[in-house]
Amino acid sequence: MEAITKYGSYFNVRFLSRLCWRLNLSSSYHYPLLKSSLSFSRFQSPKKLCLVRATTNPTDDNSTTRSFTPHPPSLWGHHFLSASVNQTEMDDLWRQIEALKPIVNAMLLPCNGADAKKITCFIHTLVSLGVSYHFEEKIVEFLKDAFENIEDMIIDCKEDDLYTVSIIFRVFRLYGHYITPDIFNRFKGDDGNFKKCLNDDVRGMLSFYEASHFGTTTEDILEEAMSFTQKHLELFLVGEKAKHYPHITKLIQAALYIPQNFNLEILVAREYIDFYELETDHNEMLLKLAKLNFRFLQLQYIQDLKTLTTWWKELDLVSKIPVYFRERLAEPYFWATGIYYEPQYSAARIMLAKSIILVDIVDNTFDVYGTIDEVKSLVQAIERWDSDAVDVLPDYLKVVFRTTFDLFKELEEYVSSEARSFTMQYAYEQLRILMKGYLQEAEWSNRGHLPSHEEYIEVGVASTAGEVLLAMTFIPMGDAAGVGVYEWLRSRPKLTHALFVKSRLRDDIATYKEEMKRGDVCNGINCYTKQHKVSEEEACIEFEKKTNHMSKVMNEEFLKAAKFIPLHILRPVLNYGRLADVCYKYGDGYTFAGEKIKDYITSLYVDLITL
């Protein structure tokens, strides 16, 4: 298959050309001069109520008037249409990156005098700076060989070197190697508690805290480590020493907010570049590579967003159907960036963002606007999956169905030429399952039925849209996601099940208050409180415990799956779990882009890193 290797190995020309043709854009890259700043309109409060003409009969568009509360507008709107990127700068950045890669690559070679322990710590730095993908094959090969002598590597560490032992643990687990947490027993005293001499080792404590989040369901020592390190890191932040080490303090604050293993790789990179630059022993070549790489990615992201915004503007759904859905562009693209941030997945990010936008519109059709008869007719049309199926739908649902149909047909045309029709077959299956999940929830609400928590979770896992979005995630990856990947997904592995449960629970905690306000009582928290006779606060605490348990299950199942599933397939799965933490741990970051999500998006797509 023809592929562009200029900016990455898997950038598919045929897919990008078709994407650009549909948008009436050239398939060649255009990066005019980036504007010095992007202006964003101030957040406008939505009107409290919209009255629109709608239908209670699937074939009658004029039978009733219904009301709905519109979602708040996006903070970014269509502003990325005016953003422009310089092709010359892109090419120059890439040339500099390519020139630095051999220099950094040489640092991964043991023959240069570095021992396995030092190289492992260096890999941790590459990962944290967001540049490890440039050296992935070399890293995987090194760790595979080094794991054969992992005991010797640990023994070679000083008895009190908590920092290095924690880094080694993190790196090997990150790459799918099971390394026992018993290596941390050396840091315990005769009383069974962690030694007091560790209290003053701030770097070691931070690294140990990060390592504790790789724990599985049976590793109690890592649970102890999490409590121990969190306590002492919080004490450090309120002490005098924090004032003297501001860059370490900032990194600790970020870790306590969301640890690296639960954070998005690209967000970790942005934070860590600032930290690494202030380290007195930083490597200038590596720092330069990290900055060049991040700026290059930012420019590509801006170009992707411009392409996505152009598609949305030409689609023009806001003039065709009532705007009962969340009109979002930067947010779904942020999700797609969180799944795969590397440059070779540009076309895949755009397609995934489009899929997220579409799924959200369908979700809101069931949740906010459609009558029970209407959504039933939509489910039946999806089951038929025929362009003639629109005849029985009301006008606004004809638009929704046609948009869904066209997006899938676009992907179908792409994969059929590559003998990859099995990918679309799986995607269709998951779309139908998703529709049935949405319909079940709508019927519960229509009847005023409150299911048991167990019933709700069973259906709610399907209605997270996780399975259909995973299918859409892998389709644009081409041969990198073969038939074996889809057979694995179809087997419903414990890893993906834990992911969907975690996502459901995170979503429920973040959104139940807004759902209750609009009269949607069939949500996870409400089901749990009524069944178990507990308060909302107690239910949220229990959901948080369950979420943490699912994170451990994911860690556990990842280590098992890594033995036979490639890392480039497993990482997007893990990244969906990380998105749940980043976007929903402290509120609904998709509907209401609070300061944190706003800062994330701004740091990636607006404020270019200074070289």
Curated annotation (Swiss-Prot):
Keywords: Cytoplasm, Lyase, Magnesium, Manganese, Metal-binding. SUPFAM superfamilies: Terpenoid cyclases/Protein prenyltransferases (SSF48239), Terpenoid synthases (SSF48576). A motif (DDXXD motif) lies at residues 363-367. Predominantly expressed in flowers but also in stems, siliques, roots and leaves. It comes from the Eukaryota. It catalyses: (2E,6E,10E)-geranylgeranyl diphosphate + H2O = (3E,7E)-dolabella-3,7-dien-18-ol + diphosphate. GO terms for cellular component: cytoplasm. Its cofactor is Mg(2+); Mn(2+). Mg(2+) 2 binds at D363, D367. Mg(2+) 3 binds at D507, T511, E515. Binds 3 Mg(2+) or Mn(2+) ions per subunit. Mg(2+) 1 binds at D363, D367. CDD domains: Terpene_cyclase_plant_C1. Its EC number is 4.2.3.167. It is found in: Cytoplasm. Pathway: Secondary metabolite biosynthesis; terpenoid biosynthesis. GO terms for molecular function: magnesium ion binding; terpene synthase activity. Transmembrane segments: none annotated. It holds the Pfam family Terpene_synth_C. GO terms for biological process: diterpenoid biosynthetic process; terpenoid biosynthetic process. Belongs to the terpene synthase family. Tpsa subfamily. The Asp-Asp-Xaa-Xaa-Asp/Glu (DDXXD/E) motif is important for the catalytic activity, presumably through binding to Mg(2+). This is Dolabella-3,7-dien-18-ol synthase TPS06. It comes from Arabidopsis thaliana (Mouse-ear cress). The lineage of its organism: Eukaryota, Viridiplantae, Streptophyta, Embryophyta, Tracheophyta.
